[in-house]
């Protein structure tokens, strides 16, 4: 949360519009409370140095899916879109998701297209990998 806030409010994303960032653990606190950052942008002069509201920058950041609660991932998808969520496992740490595909199955309202994006389509697109190439090996 703190690192992402520094990247946003420090103008890094304005200076480097093509920068690709992936935030662990769903970006922590920030996506759930980006309204607070947007409010700060509107009322604090030192925060108004960036070009857009913080919520607009969130849509340029990728987030892993490891948020531990299906409802939390549903909310993250609403905030940033499924196209910016990558499968997260936290491997090799013991707090990780051993069967992340089962976690995705528990997310309310997740469509098959969104599930496929999160399971690997988004990572392939982000990394410039032909997702169909592995099926031809």
What would you call each of these model-derived segments?
Residues 1-84, 137:
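Catalytic pocket-lining loop regions of alpha/beta-barrel enzymes
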Residues 19, 29, 63, 67-86, ...:
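Mid-to-C-terminal alpha-helical segments outside catalytic/metal-binding sites
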């Amino acid at each position: 949360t703190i690192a992402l806030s520094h990247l946003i409010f420090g103008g890094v994303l304005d200076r480097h519009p093509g920068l690709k960032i992936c935030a662990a653990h769903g970006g922590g606190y920030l996506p759930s409370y980006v309204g607070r950052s947007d409010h700060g942008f509107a009322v604090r002069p030192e925060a108004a140095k960036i070009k857009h509201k913080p919520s607009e920058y969130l849509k340029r950041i990728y987030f892993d899916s490891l948020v531990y609660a299906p409802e939390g991932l549903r909310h993250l998808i609403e905030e940033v879109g499924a196209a910016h969520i990558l499968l997260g496992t936290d491997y090799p740490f013991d707090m990780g998701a051993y069967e992340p595909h089962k976690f995705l199955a528990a997310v309310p309202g997740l469509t098959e297209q969104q599930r496929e994006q999160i399971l690997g389509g988004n990572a392939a697109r982000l990394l410039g990998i032909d997702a169909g190439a592995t099926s031809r090996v």
